[in-house]
Amino acid sequence: MNRTRQTTDKSKNRITALYERLSRDDELAGDSNSIVNQKKMLEDYAKSNGYTDLVHFTDDGYSGGNFDRPGWKEMLWQIEDGSIGTVIVKDMSRVGRDYLQVGFYTEVFFREKGVHFVAISNGVDSDINTLSLIHISE
């Protein structure tokens, strides 16, 4: 689906954060979620949907069970700073495995900060209010 991204005033001139995470358990299970694959998927999606100023935030080898991850924390800091207008992830499980924390970030924190959120594989786009319909994959 190719569509031109209409930039809102809130996300105009702000970074598009591409967030990747892979835990050691994911890697050992042979999942096709390698960091390289996630980066390519996120870049392809962002470019085909008109997102610009792409910046990767990566946590390789970190569990989604906690949110004390360097890439995640750096991204949150830049959201607080007002530098990031959009966050794109492969799927909701890349954000984390704790349903309450994921819900807080996607439904409260990002919205309060005026950050547009997209989870590609889950069909989540906060601009069209799909967040509350999604279950995080285990």
Please place each PLM-identified region on the residue numbering.
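Short, structured surface patches at the beginning of a domain
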Residues: 1-137
